[in-house]
From Swiss-Prot:
Annotated positions binding Zn(2+) 1: 116, 118
Organism: Mycobacterium tuberculosis (strain ATCC 25618 / H37Rv)
Keywords noted in UniProt: DNA-binding, Metal-binding, Repressor, Transcription, Transcription regulation, Zinc
PROSITE patterns, alphabetized: HTH_ARSR_2
Role of this protein: Transcriptional regulator involved in zinc homeostasis. Represses the expression of the smtB-zur operon in the absence of zinc. Could act as the metal sensor that controls the expression of zur in response to zinc availability.
The protein's name: HTH-type transcriptional repressor SmtB
Domain HTH arsR-type: start-end pairs: 40-134
Pfam families: HTH_5
Regulation of activity: Binding to DNA is inhibited by zinc ions.
Lineage: Bacteria, Bacillati, Actinomycetota, Actinomycetes, Mycobacteriales
Amino acid sequence: MVTSPSTPTAAHEDVGADEVGGHQHPADRFAECPTFPAPPPREILDAAGELLRALAAPVRIAIVLQLRESQRCVHELVDALHVPQPLVSQHLKILKAAGVVTGERSGREVLYRLADHHLAHIVLDAVAHAGEDAI
């Protein structure tokens, strides 16, 4: 059988990795996966879904990244993100309701901070992954 250099042959098809979406994966990747325990209770899955929905907006992702550095008041977030104050306040309300941020009054302003820095890791991983795909 004659093949062109760009046509893979059977000898080249199973080289131990396949290309999926720009990422390398072992050809037999599912055989190597550990067996996972039973899924968490439905309440935990629902709570995780709510948390991820609260983070699922570009402005809210940017807010979490800003608060990762230090606590901020609304006008600091407006200046850093270049979005209108009512929009920042609306997104902070959603993040606060989801338990992502907390607010503490300081004089006439409210200082917002992350309730849990584990959430910053989720956002950082998502942003890093999106950046890999953009290259």
